[in-house]
């Protein structure tokens, strides 16, 4: 039996992790959500005794501690894998390039703060709260769901100028995961920043709400991967991500890798 906890599990990639992992009845799966569960998560959990839904807003340190305590009560105070998936895509000005914030310094701070509170500080606080359980687990893995947007080479090659707050907080958390790897290596704990690819989720559709914008995004990403044809299904992405997680080695700990297990971000 393996135990898994996933933040941001109400929909999208987080929900799919909970769905695929709980399909194996020998797994204990904890879907951590900010508020009320989505209809699909509520329906799924009602039919799976090994899937537990727990409220845990990653911006609320006290709530995270309470959620970790609830998980510990059900697992014997241990956890095998923690997946930090909750994220914030940015505010109304997320499609502004950096230089466009001249004269909009207040809006720039708001943009960065909104992303930082979830993507960086929220991730750190959630990992710290669940770390005592990971220390007692058998698999001892901490996974952060990152993005190609947090990679400098991807940004340079594709010419991505927007989503400033989202991108820099993802990049910052990639480094934090390397810090965790260095700190926890002696305890046998492995960490990984894992990019899911370009995935067909509500979040992606919000970022590209029209067919025209989606086509523009495809053309940008084809600069990195010329044979890219479109969005990947969330089911396929999570299957590939789980393969990377299950095969995570000590040598890979602290790296940022794609769903392919390499640096092919798309």
From Swiss-Prot:
Out of the domains of life, which is the source? Eukaryota
Q: What happens when the gene is disrupted?
A: Abolishes the production of arthripenoids but leads to the accumulation of a new compound that has a keto group at position C4.
What is the uppermost EC class here? oxidoreductase
Could you list the residue ranges that cross the membrane?
A: none
Keywords attached to this entry = NADP, Oxidoreductase
Q: Which residues bind NADP(+)?
A: 13, 57, 85, 166, 170, 199, 201
Q: What is the lineage of its organism?
A: Eukaryota, Fungi, Dikarya, Ascomycota, Pezizomycotina
List the active-site residues. Answer: 147, 166, 170
Which pathway, per its entry? Secondary metabolite biosynthesis; terpenoid biosynthesis
* The protein's Enzyme Commission number: 1.1.1.-
The UniProt record lists the keyword NADP: yes
Q: What is the annotated role of this protein in its UniProt record? A: Short-chain dehydrogenase/reductase; part of the gene cluster that mediates the biosynthesis of the meroterpenoids arthripenoids. The pathway begins with the HR-PKS atnH that catalyzes two chain-extension steps to form a reduced triketide, which then primes the SAT domain in the NR-PKS atnG to initiate three more cycles of extension to give a linear hexaketide corresponding to the polyketide part of arthripenoids.
Q: What is the protein name for this chain?
A: Short-chain dehydrogenase/reductase atnB
